[in-house]
Structures are given as C-alpha cells and as structure tokens.
Amino acid sequence: MRLWSWVLRLGLLSAALGCGLAERPRRVRRDPRAVRPPRPAAGPATCATRAARGRRASPPPPPGGAWEAVRVPRRRQQRAARGAEEPSPPSRALYFSGRGEQLRLRADLELPRDAFTLQVWLRAEGGQKSPAVITGLYDKCSYTSRDRGWVMGIHTTSDQGNRDPRYFFSLKTDRARKVTTIDAHRSYLPGQWVHLAATYDGRLMKLYMNGAQVATSAEQVGGIFSPLTQKCKVLMLGGSALNHNFRGHIEHFSLWKVARTQREIVSDMETRGLHTPLPQLLLQENWDNVKRTWSPMKDGNSPQVEFSNAHGFLLDTNLEPPLCGQTLCDNTEVISSYNQLPSFRQPKVVRYRVVNIYDDHHENPTVSWQQIDFQHQQLAEAFQHYNISWELEVLNINSSSLRHRLILANCDISKIGDEKCDPECNHTLTGHDGGDCRQLRYPAFMKKQQNGVCDMDCNYERFNFDGGECCDPDITDVTKTCFDPDSPHRAYLDVNELKNILRLDGSTHLNIFFANSSEEELAGVATWPWDKEALMHLGGIVLNPSFYGIPGHTHTMIHEIGHSLGLYHIFRGISEIQSCSDPCMETEPSFETGDLCNDTNPAPKHKFCGDPGPGNDTCGFHGFFNTPYNNFMSYADDDCTDSFTPNQVSRMHCYLDLVYQSWQPSRKPAPVALAPQVVGHTMDSVMLEWFPPIDGHFFERELGSACDLCLEGRILVQYAFNASSPMPCGPSGHWSPREAEGHPDVEQPCKSSVRTWSPNSAVNPHTVPPACPEPQGCYLELEFRYPLVPESLTIWVTFVSSDWDSSGAVNDIKLLTISGKNISLGPQNVFCDIPLTIRLRDVGEEVYGIQIYTLDEHLEIDAAMLTSTVDSPLCLQCKPLQYKVLRDPPLLEDVASLLHLNRRFMDTDLKLGSVYQYRIITISGNEESEPSPAAIYTHGSGYCGDGVIQKDQGEECDDMNKVNGDGCSLFCKQEVSFNCIDEPSRCYFHDGDGMCEEFEQKTSIKDCGVYTPQGFLDQWASNASVSHQDQQCPGWVVIGQPAASQVCRTKVIDLSEGISQHAWYPCTITYPYYHLPQTTFWLQTYFSQPMVAAAVIIHLVTDGTYYGDQKQETISVQLLDTKDQSHDLGLHVLSCRNNPLIIPVVHDLSQPFYHSQAVHVSFSSPLVAISGVALRSFDNFDPVTLSSCQRGETYSPAEQSCVHFACQAADCPELAVGNASLNCSSNHHYHGAQCTVSCQTGYVLQIQRDDELIKSQVGPSITVTCTEGKWNKQVACEPVDCGIPDHHHVYAASFSCPEGTTFGRRCSFQCRHPAQLKGNNSFLTCMEDGLWSFPEALCELMCLAPPPVPNADLQTARCRENKHKVGSFCKYKCKPGYHVPGSSRKSKKRAFKTQCTQDGSWQEGTCVPVTCDPPPPKFHGLYQCTNGFQFNSECRIKCEDSDASQGRGSNIIHCRKDGTWSGSFHVCREMQGQCSAPNQLNSNLKLQCPDGYAIGSECAISCLDHNSESIILPVNLTVRDIPHWMNPTRVQRIVCTAGLQWYPHPALIHCVKGCEPFMGDNYCDAINNRAFCNYDGGDCCTSTVKTKKVTPFPMSCDLQNDCACRDPEAQEHNRKDLRGYSHG
C-alpha cells in the first residue's frame, strides 16, 4: 500500500470514497463514489489545466530525508573517516547511458575457472532493459553453447514482465544442463549507490547486497569451464553482445579467483574495494585508464568517465513508513517520539475559515451566525484537552448565482442523465438524476417542443430537457428548472466547481465549505494530509449545512478535522480492508495495521454506543471488547463520542508539523523528530549525525521564493504544475492531465488508478482502436514552475498495458527549452513500480517542460519531477536552516554548537565514563524548534553501530553502520526475513538460502519443505482429475509437493499463464468474471497409500477473491474412503492469510474408522488456484489395523500390522548395504540399536519406507533403528546417474553410451558433419556430482568449400578450399545479364557475399536473370518472345511486308542487360478499327471510357461498392472460392489491344471486399486476415504483431478460425529451430 521508499509516500485512496477523500455519513452509510475535481475548459478536443492549482506555502511535504534519498548516495565510508569531518575525495565512475557502450576486457588475464568473487559499486537508473547486464562472462566461440558463463544484472521477476525488477546473479557451468539464477530479496532502488558481490566456490552461488547475503543456491557444482575453452571466454561490462545494456554508474570493480567470505566482502566494501595487490586478486578497477584494460564493442561507444562525490554522511536518513502507512508520521520511530515527548505536543493554534455564501443582498446565508458560533465553541471544547486551539475566520461571499444553486458533495455530474439511476445524484434540483430515477411517462413531446415554456414533464435528458427551454433564463427561473449537466445555467454545482470558482488559498487556512448530498445523508468529506490538494484551493473540508452547528451533530466537523489531521476511522482494520487477507487487517492494537494507533482496539463499523457483536464481515472475530466506541473517529452519535486517544493526538500534532505549519500563526520551525545518532568515536571524541527536520526543509521559507523546493547542495527539485494533452478529457475528470501534476500519489503501482493521466480516459469504447496511432502516438505535456538547467528527470509510469513490453510503451520524451529547441531523448524502458530516471547532465540549457509520447493508449503517468544541477541560481540566495546542539552537561562556551547545512557534530570535550545527553534544535530566523529526543551516550561504552550487540539497550544486531536494508537496521534491529550472527553482525536473508534452521521449520517451504508436525505423516497427491481439463492448465500439476517459490495472491484481476505451471485453476473459463454463470469447479486428488486421515491440507496460489469485489470464496471438501463412501468435511473460507488451509478430520468414535484414498474439492470461483493437496495421517499408528488385532496379537508401529505378542524383543538381522560404510552403536543388533549409513562417493541414498513411498535423499548419511526385529527404514546406495549428455555439452556432436550413464561410466562422442574434432580424447566420464566431465576435445564447426552458385563466378580464391571458420565470407559476382535479387531496378547489384553459418552450412546466394518490363498492354497477345522478358530474349510482332517496304523497319525488340528494351513496338498498318463495347461485365462493376474504344484506349474500371476493390481471377473461380493465401492482382483499367481485344478480359474481373484501414494497429481484424491485406499488417500472428500478443477485434473473433495466424511467412509456420539464448 506504499509508494516507493525513496520518494514521498503520499496519496492513499480513501477507504471511504476511493479517491483521496475521507467522509462521514449521517449515521447511515458511506458513499463509495470517487469524487474528482473538474478542470477548466481548454478548447475543443483538448484537455488541459492552464491555471495554477493553488500556491503552497511548502513543497509537497516529504518525509525527513526522503528528498535526500533522491539525490544522495547511501555509502559506507572508510573506518578511518569516522573520526574526521572532511568528506572523502571524489572517485572515478563510468556512466553507461544504455545505448551501446558495453566494454569487453582486453587485458591478457586468465579468467577464474573454479571459483571467483565479483564485487562492484554501482548506482542504477530507474528503468532498464530486462535483463540489463551489469557484467558477465560470455562464450564467443561458435562451437560452444552461448548460454554458458555467469551474469550479474537487473531483470524482472514478475510474470507480467514490467514490474518487480531485481538484481540477479546467474551461472551455468560448461557441464551444467541449465542456468541457475538467484535474485535479490527486493526490487532495486534507482539512484542509490549499492555494493553488489557475487561468489561461487564450486558448490555454492551467493549474492550479497551492501554486505548482506540475500540469495544463495547449490544447483551448480564443479568448475565453470575447462582450460580448453579459456580463449573462448570474454568478460563484458555494462551490457552484452545482444544489447542488453545497463544504465547507470559503475564505480569500483574487482574480480578475485577465490570465493571471498562475507566478512571479507564487508571489509572490501568499507575500504571501497582498494587493495594492495594480492595473488588471488585478478582485477581491480578505479578507472584511471579505461582504454588500457577495456575496449568498446565493434561500432559501440565508450562510457563516460566521471567523478562521483560520495556523501560525507554516515547516517541513512531514509525512514520508511509501515506497509499500511503513507508518510513519516506513520513511521513507528517518529510517532513514538511524538507519543513520548510532551514538548512535541505543545499548544498549537490552527486557523480555519468558514466559507458562508449569501445572496447578492447579503441575505439568506448558507449557515447562520448562531450555527457558526455554536460549532466553534464545540470545536474549541473538543480540542482544548489536546493542546490544539482553533482560530476562526468567516469569509462571507455575496453571490445569488452560487447561493441559489444546489452544491452537491458526492455526485459525479457526468452521471446525471446517463440512463442509470445513481442514488447520490437523486435530488429534486437534478431532476432526479436527469430523469434516470423516475419512471417516465411519454408525453406529447413533439407538441410541446419549442413552445416557449419549460414543460417539467419533458424536463429530462431523454427529451433533451424540453429542447433546452428549461435552461433558458429568458423563459424560466433556471435555478429551479435547469437540470441539463451541460448547461452553464444548471441549478446545481459540484463542490469542486464551487472551489474552482472561489479559488481560496488552502495554504494559510483549513477551508470549510458547505454542500448537500442526495437525501441529505452525507455529513462530511475531508481531504487527507497526504493528498495533492491538501494545501491547495481544492482541499479543505466539505460539510452538510443542515447539520453544521446543530446540537447533536457538531461532532461531525470534529470527526472530519480528525481526517484532515491524519486520523483514520477506528474501524479501518476490520471494516475498511479489502479482504480478510489484507495485510492491514488489525487483529490487535498496532502502530502498523488498522488505524495505525496502538491504543484503539480492533472494532467493526457500527453506530451504537457500546461494544459491537460479531458480524458477517469480521473475518472470524468472535467478539470485540473494550472498543473505542466513544472515540470521535467512530460512527457513534454525539451523545456518545467524547475523546481522542493519546496516539491519535500524537498523529495530529505530527501532521501539523509535517504538512500544516502554514496554517499556524507561529513561525516556529519543524523539529528534528528522532534523537541524534552516534556514528563514530575515538578515545577522546564522539561523532553525531541527525535527521533533517520532519518537514524536509533545509532552507528558511520566504514568500515568493523557491527556497522551499531547495535541498542540500542547493539543488532545486520540483514536480510539474501545469499539464495538458490534445487527447480529450472524460467528463468525470479521471485520468485527466491534471492528475499528473504534483507529487506521485498512486497507492498501488501496476494497477490502474484514476489518480493518473491516461490517453484512453475519454476514448469511446465503441470506436475502433488504436487511440494512439503510430508513429507519434499520444502525448502528455508537463510544465514546471521554474525553468532550470536540469541534472535529471524522474517520471512515474505506474501502469503499462500487458500488450506492450517495457520498451514499447514510452516511445519518446522531449525536453522543451526556453530557447525554443526541443530535445528528443528517444524511447525509454519503464517499470510500473520503479520510477523512470533519466540523467540530463549534458543538456546545458534551461528546460521549462517535457512531452511524453506513448503508443499504449492504456499507459498511466502519475507524476514527473525535474531536478536542477548543484548550486541552482534559484537556491543561491536562500538562507539555510541552522542547528543547535544542546548537551547535558552543557558544552563549553567556546565550542561552536551552531551549525548550518551540516547535520554532523564532533564533541571533543569528553570524560571517560561520563554520561552525556544530546538534543538538536532547528533555528529559522529568530525562531527555534522544540528540542529533538535525547541521545544518551556514555563515553567509553558501547553504542548502536560499534559492532558489539548491547542487548541491555535493546540491540538485536550490530553491523557497525547506520544503514537500513542490509539486514540490520540503523537502530540495530534485525530486519524482516533476515538473520544476523556474530559480532560485528553478519546478516543473511534466510528464506530460500537452502539451510533449514530451527526458527524457520514451520514457515519456510523453500528451505524446510512443507512442515509436518511431529507424530504425523503427510502424503501428497499421486494422481488428480479435474472438472476443466486443458493442456494449458493440466490437473497433474497438483501432484506432489507444491512449488516452494509460489506466494498466495489475493484480489486478482485475472490469472496469468505462468500460474498453470505450479497450480491448477479452470483456465478454460474465458468470459468476464462478472458475467460468470453459476458454475461448480472441482478437483479430486488420489493418494497411493490409503490412510486414516487426521487432516486435509490445501495449498493455495490464489484465494478466489476478485479485484473489484469484497466477496470471500468458500471451498467444499469431502473425503472418499476405500469403499467409495463420501465423508463431508464441510464448507471453509479461503484466505491467503490462512494458507495452507488445514482442515481437521473429526472421527465419530461411535463409528468404525476408515481409510481415505481421495480428497474431493469443489468451489465456484474461477480465480481459485490450488498448488497441492496433502492427506495427513498418524505416523506409525493405524486405528483400522489396530482394531483388527486378534487375541495374542499386538499392533507393531514398525510393521504397521498385527504381530504375535512376544515378551522378549527380537534382534534385527545383519544390516547389509552395498557401496556404503556403516557406523553402528553396537556390535549387536538388538531392539533400539542404531546404525548410520553413509554412501560412498558417487552413490546416493535411496530410502524405502514401504512398497509405495520411495524417495531419494540428497544428504550424505542416514540413521536407521532396530525396532521389534526389523530395521525401520530400507536403505540402498545407488550409483549417481548422469543421464545422456546434453547436446550442448559438446556442441555439434552425437553421443554413444554403451556402458550406461551411471557413476564412473564413459560415453564417447563423434562430431556431426561438417564439424571437425579438435583434440584427441573424445570420451566423457560420469562424475560423482551427477554431471559429465569436461570434454578434452571439441567439435569445431567448419564449412567445406562453398557449392557453386548458378550464373555466378567465385571471386575469393581461398574459398575453393575446405575448412572455413564460422563467420568467414566468400565473395561472388553474377554473370552479365544476371543480378542479386532484391536490388533496386535502377542499380542492379551483381556482387554479393555468403557467410559460413553456425550449423556448418553456407548462406544461400543466388543470381537471377535481368528482366525487362512487359511491352505496353495494347500489344498484348500479338508478340512472341524467345525467353519471356529475360535478358537476351527477342520479342517480335509479324507485320505485312508493306510495313518494311514503307521504311518502318522490323517490329523486333531485344531485352538488354541493363533491363531495358532495345527499341519499341509499333502498330502494324493492317491493325485498324476499334474494340467493341466491353460486355460480359460482372453486375457489381462499372466502366468509364472517356477516350472511346480505339486501339490503345483505356477504360477505368471500378466497383459499385466503394468498400470493394476490382481484381483479376482465373477462369471458373469466383470471389467466394478465394482462399486466404491467394493474393489476386488488383486492376484499375482495361485497354483495347491492337488485336481489337480488351485486356484484361472483362469477364475475369471481379469485386472483392477491400481492406479495412486498420492494418498494423495491433488488433487482429478478421476481414483483413488474408494475403490480399498482408494478413492485417502482421496483427494476427504473435511473431509479427508489435505487441507480441494477438488481440482479436472484435473480442468474439475466434483465434482458431477467422483470427488465426494464417501468414505462411510467420515464424509460427517456420519449422526451423528458433530458440534464443539466455544470459541476455
């Protein structure tokens, strides 16, 4: 529910209105409508906001330090720097722009083969190709597989492909069958320095971030490559040969030939990678001389070498709110300070302004003075106990035009007259929703039309509001009769229209407006403090005047003010969650869930004055006790509510400091909310650093200046303040350009939000797409208040259609400069959950705006931010805030404790063992803030950050730094999913590290498998059948244990295809969720060993809840016994919160026990996905067998059967296990004896518990126990089986394994023609790790001499011999009269090259004859040619001798080698007359012959239907017979030939349906899906459509029939192997 941690967390959609407004009904209901303000008109067909949206007294209030995180690298410094104040010197870094600057290592280094460590400091830009290669080891030889080697980079981990990008490390040794990729534990953070390290020791891959181990894998084993292929390996930096290029800075780079330990990596990181040369250190780079070691790729560029200034601060000031929070005031440390320090809750005076509207004569006010005065008294009384007092200002406005109109609080005016009754718009003065809420009679409208009278029975949208007469001020009183939402005279206004008319400054007062709701149910609406509008004219509180200042209703305003000051409803955690799986559900009072107050018990929404009873919407709560029903933030009546809790009071004071300082007369600056932190010490000094003030300001605020936008370094950061687009605006205003102004406020990136601009907002859904046609597409123009020379641009693109990959959505960004020049930045790769950042350091001139272009009509843009270079002229005159350090005992007078722009202080006046308290005061002008919380430091003792864990001070870890995100927080608390060991702490992300530790046995499926309690046995499904079987979602995927990587998802829109690889769901259901008829889906799983069930366990991947619905899905479960009897286990609610679902089986003890063999599961939602079903039974205990034991028998748990009772336990037989060593506890195998079985090298344990349950154990040994004369486990050591060698193990080879493929066996290989064996040993050996040995010979692909090309001469002499390397060329030249096909008619190329390809064959090359154009059509049928129209062909027309005798020459022409004729034909003398009028025309053709019918005359031919085209078809073929693959010739005219025949013959001409003008628009149109229309421009095949996903139009078009991929040239119909390669 948060935005990104490095930028302002604002913009929670209200749980009440879904659009940023909190509301309070009149004890009846909450209004669910999203209310968005309209914008001024901007001319026809455009959508813009050309007026400023209101002045802010402060910038969008960032959390303290969040501004800084945008600009400042978070770096660990050298330990030596801890005692000094001087910043570290700048170091060099390479900047890669992502446009072909990848480097390759040119130094003659022997790259590590067996183990290595790679370390790099980098800062990545937001938005990358996926994958983006930071560095990688590749194989350049043609005779090896290209996916071998290792890569470090960034890629997306989500099925959707444009979200959740993470750092990754992938490796595939030359012996491995597949690549292993491990990912970091979270998305990468753009613009932040990070230290990455990757290690491999021949057994384990590990990835480290900032010294913390975040991922590991044991899949790859052994060496990386053999010495034989050393020369094939190339080390790349900044990208790959396939242009998977990285964008960002790379600073230090080092490569070791050993796997460094975590402690060594932490040490390397702190020394910034600078080492004295060591034998195991192969390469360390600080970019002093890049060209000496690295070279750019062919036709590539070199990255820029820059100086990077590491920030001098050691304290990470990036504080995150909890998952359910929004701003700094939700951070648990910050709000704890406000709870604990009374000084932070000192008296505050807040100004508020009541907007009271009168008529023009200053009469008939909206509310009376008595109401205003009484409400003010009640307000003052309610807040007086909490040190908040209110200063009233009343603004009287005389305007009859406003006073006589109805002001609507919660009605979207665009819904009036939309043929659907909207209760919130059902009011007398809206004509009862424009007639939509009335059953209308049909009056004689035509008789009353334009009769000069407003006829109320015709005053509805259906009758155009009486033809407009009811909105004519010359005819009627429009304040009572005008209901037309499009009329400027209408009798009602939306409350935001009122705000736009008044345009009251929201930065100095809390504005109180009055508006009505339909049926007067809505009592109030408030603006959250994190909304964009909070300090603008569109903010404030809207109240119902009928309740304002009325006894019994005065607490409504107090409730709404609570919302404005950051308070949620006390029932948020129960009644305002999206589902019972919502992470914000409150089960106990907490700072992190529900209403974020830990002194309000969970409660559901109700209006009674007492604890509520349980209800249907309480997620299993059986009762609520000690609920805060008397709280102002409940829905109880005024005679019940009377207080705020201390936590709520702290939140209100925090928001008054964070956001609303400008509402207060006091000029006191905001405090530093947290205690200063000790970041270093020496024997005689201590170093302190502290957080910025809570409001994020660094300079004194001055009216009319930009100082409130300036950060440390005098860098100006501003969001767009004016937006426009040529795209039309929707009437609701949602997705309008205005939504892209201000700071980002989308609550959930990657989900569509009305708080963004989208080009599709007002597109008519009935129009044919696309809305954004190529090549330009749609664009959004954003302007910034202050033109500046930019350093960087940040854009939040929060939604991209699944039809587009990350690179196609934003096809250009243009910078608009003051000089009038537009600078194009080109297409950009975007992620929907990571903002796009673009460096603009080279622009060098002032920019005032940007234009963002897109081809994706569903794209959504949330915000844009422009950052200046250092020392911006706009910030140079700003006065920095000062900080005063208060110490107890006090500092000496001569010690400077007053600092500015430096949040660091060194105290050298210390005594060993003395206790010191430090507080920070912020100074602005003559005003001082309240002191910060105190830091208590005992000189000579420990502190958080010294590497020693002081448990008595609450420390859980200490990694010797003050940085978050590395497993140990800056407050020395262990971070979620990390475990820290040793001192100083070494932290690792434990979930998925391959080690099953005691604390994660019950929680980590990845490391420990599915947890089974002691005494039980879980049996997973061995077979399955399903109701909706399909090859896309087969039922067999639920067999066995569920995939460890799957996470349960709730509130989904649809299920991606990737889910069907791990879980079953009814994927054949294609109709929309809302139109789904009642359907029962079922899954039945079978188990190989029938058992007495103790429980059924069901693992979910989705819980069936739909994104737009609150309904919880239920599931019905039955057990089937061995007699096919059904046993009902009841109905159960599905929830990801309770995953897996464990259903206990209760047996009726009055009935016999039964063995269960199957489980039947049924449900009704197509959004339920199940990944596994288990049957839990008692281990070594079977009640059914036990009950069958006869007299003299006893139940044996080992045998699980009845055995004859014996008083003396029997010994076990001698344990014999081949290929194993045994270590037994005794020489005698009596009852209870144990033996440890360890397999020899190359053998693996096989454990057999009974005939059906068999599994392999990877572990090296196992212990077996003698129980009642029988070993409890049957164990064998089987040889490792390497399987048939993979075809990539030796490229271009075939394998023969006559000895088998188990441990120690050998296979031979032979090179496939034309590959040549390079080396002598063509054998492979199966090794103990289950992989084949490195080959000691290779099959080098060579081409034989190229075959002769007809009609061409070989020009390259060496090509007449054999043995040509892959990639070599041979040159040919076509013989005279022949040319290369495809060359232009004007310049026919004769020379061409063929290349030796990777499969050992040559590229095809051909020479085709030169051809001449056909002679003019009037000679058709009269000439004979010796060889058609090809070179050297002779064509002649026989004329009578009289032609030659009269000197006209012979009628013979020759085709010359340049493609022209040697002459031209003439009409013979005897060829006289004219053609007869054309007949045999098809009925749908028409002919125009303006020149008559003489020889050579032409007649234009066309179709009567303008949507058809005229074509030629063969004889006896009609239009109905045309197959889709036929491309008939178009014909536009016929000509009368010299033989007095029409050509083409009119009878062969037909009319066929023409092509619709939507080819190449990314939608497959059935009418165009034929060769005649170029198969709709490629839109009907996945391989040819630009979006790589076929979208039929209309949606009902069958993808297997009319909208199928028919293009024979598409890859789908090409049998050639088209596999790509991994590793970028």
From Swiss-Prot:
One of its GO terms (cellular component) is extracellular space. Detected in kidney, spleen, brain, ovary, breast, skin, prostate, uterus, and placenta. One of its GO terms (molecular function) is endopeptidase activity. Zn(2+) binds at H559, H563, H569. Keywords: Disulfide bond, Glycoprotein, Hydrolase, Metal-binding, Metalloprotease, Protease, Repeat, Secreted, Signal, Sushi, Zinc, Zymogen. Binds 1 zinc ion per subunit. PROSITE patterns: SUSHI, ZINC_PROTEASE. It is found in: Secreted. Glycans are attached at N387, N398, N426, N516, N598, N616, N722, N822, N1023, N1219, N1223, N1320, N1516. Gene3D superfamilies: 2.60.120.200, Collagenase (Catalytic Domain) (3.40.390.10), Complement Module, domain 1 (2.10.70.10). Residues 28-93 are annotated as: Disordered. One of its GO terms (biological process) is proteolysis. It catalyses: Cleavage of the 135-Met-|-Lys-136 bond in insulin-like growth factor binding protein (IGFBP)-4, and the 143-Ser-|-Lys-144 bond in IGFBP-5. Metalloproteinase which specifically cleaves IGFBP-4 and IGFBP-5, resulting in release of bound IGF. Cleavage of IGFBP-4 is dramatically enhanced by the presence of IGF, whereas cleavage of IGFBP-5 is slightly inhibited by the presence of IGF. Isoform 2 cleaves IGFBP-4 very slowly compared to PAPP-A, but its ability to cleave IGFBP-5 is unaffected. NCBIfam families: myxo_disulf_rpt. PANTHER family: LAMGL DOMAIN-CONTAINING PROTEIN, PAPPALYSIN-1. This is Pappalysin-1. It comes from Mus musculus. The gene is Pappa.
